């Protein structure tokens, strides 16, 4: 059974091996599979400037093995859209705020993409954001993500026009966080309730405002 773990600076010391596997899988997916050669590293770990203490990870585990994950980052800090992709946003108006996060490095391992792992991670994404008071999440994605999000019940608005990135048409978009979207994606994932796992003692709410 797939479980989705919330990893922050508060508990990442207990997830050292999990994060190491996640970073190596990111290299496999984004460098080796998708061909994003600018991200290649000789140690086989895809790590960047946003893998710092402000990052929150939702990691999908099955039998102790990482099968997927994503990274969330506060938009009141310099983040990927503001630093690398401002040209993808109409009029350069970067969507920021204490209730807005950026999502990057989403993946499901190749052998699990035909099952429900993808929908479970998307459900965990909506669940986490609702719990944290997040209203929207921004992302730069390939265009084929839009029908997938629509099928999952996500409400998405473009922030600009499609642009070629790494030889793929990509778009900056904002996902609205809502109970309605959570209920629909839970149904698709075969879930009857919450799917997030946090520490045994409840984590304090994740800080989204730049310290």
Predicted segments, located by residue:
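Short amphipathic alpha-helix that is part of the acyltransferase structural core
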Residues: 1-46, 57-59, 66
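Short, solvent-exposed loop/turn elements at beta->coil junctions and helix N-caps
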Residues: 42-49, 160-163
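A short helix-loop-beta-strand connector motif used in the catalytic cores of GNAT acetyltransferases and
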Residues: 47-58, 80
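Short connector loops at helix/strand junctions that flank enzyme active sites
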Residues: 53-55, 65-67, 96-101
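Conserved GNAT-family N-acetyltransferase fold
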Residues: 58, 70, 106
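Short, His- and charge-rich active-site/binding loops that engage polyanionic ligands
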Residues: 61-92
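Acyl-donor binding region in acyl/amide transferases
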Residues: 80-170, 174-175, 179
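Charge-rich, low-complexity intrinsically disordered segments
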Residues: 168-211
